Structure formats: structure tokens, C-alpha cells
Amino acid sequence: MIAAAREVYAEGGLQAPFSAVAKRAGVGQGSLYRHFPDRTALAVAVFQDNVRDLEDHTAPPDRTIDDLLDRVVDQAVVSTAFIELITADLSDRRVASLGARFQALVDRLVARDRAAGRIGSHVETDDVTMATSMLATEVARAEPALRPAAARRARALFAAAFAPR
């Protein structure tokens, strides 16, 4: 069911109907609801893997904000629904938990890059989080053949904005 939901969200975003997920999974909607009582429960189950991947990818001490942005581009090609979820209204504790994990890894990278002189002292965690969301959205919205160029343009803007002054 989670694999089916990942595919459906990749195609239709978080607003894709539960019925589409159930159909793709080859189960009835009742079965889907028994395991996942609402859309958020299913989305969180699907995207825990994305957060874990970002955490693992950025954990080594030599990893930077650039490494995070590269991985976000890879994930955005598959699904903007993940970025939609972690930048959504965080009043739901399940979503807030994923958002907090993402925020913690960005905090770590900002501190690391600032200490190494790779970014300016003016760069805040919220700036990088916003850049991540913008990058993922632009890449996912672009035609597949134009995605590398869209990512390069966005990355050039962020590099200029984040550079030490």
C-alpha cells in the first residue's frame, strides 16, 4: 500500500484520492482506511523514508547544503508531494514530526557550512528550508527534459544568495 501511495502521490500530489491509492495497491478502500485512517497518516508513512534518506545522506561530516539540495532535486523528480507535506501546516503532530526532523538536519548543515565559511552569517535555517521547497517545486513542475536546467538556475540563485559577504 505504501509503494502504491508513493506512486500515486508522485503522479497526483498529496490531493490524489484514496481510491486511486487503493486501486493501485489492489485493495479495497476499506483495507486502506483500516491501515491508514486518514490522508495524513498515509502520507507520513510514505514520506518517512524520504526524511530518513535525507538524514542518512547528510549525516557524514563532509556533507553540505549543496548535498542536501542535490538530494532534494532527486526526490523532487519522483515526488513534490514530500516537499508539500514537510512544508505544510505543521499543526498535525505527525507532519510536525517529519518537519522537525527535516528542520534539524537543515540546522546541522547551516551550522556546519557557516563554520566552514561556505555560507554567510546572514543565512538562516529558514532560508535554506525555503530554498529547498522552491527548488523542489520548480524542478518537479518543469518538463522532464528541462529539469536539469531548472535545477541549475535555482542552484545558481541560491549560491549567490547564500555566499559569504
Kindly label every feature range from the protein language model.
Residues 25-27, 133:
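Hydrophobic alpha-helical membrane segments, chiefly transmembrane helices and signal peptide h-regions
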Residues 62-165:
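An extended, acidic
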Residues 21-23, 48, 105-111:
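Short acidic alpha-helix initiation/capping motifs at coil-to-helix transition points
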Residues 1, 21-24, 39, 127-128, ...:
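Generic hydrophobic secondary-structure packing signal
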Residues 30:
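Key DNA-contact positions within bacterial/archaeal DNA-binding proteins
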Residues 2-3, 10, 14-15, 19, ...:
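An amphipathic alpha-helix adjacent to DNA-recognition modules
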Residues 1-10, 94-95, 99:
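A short, flexible low-complexity segment enriched in Lys/Arg and Gly/Pro that occurs
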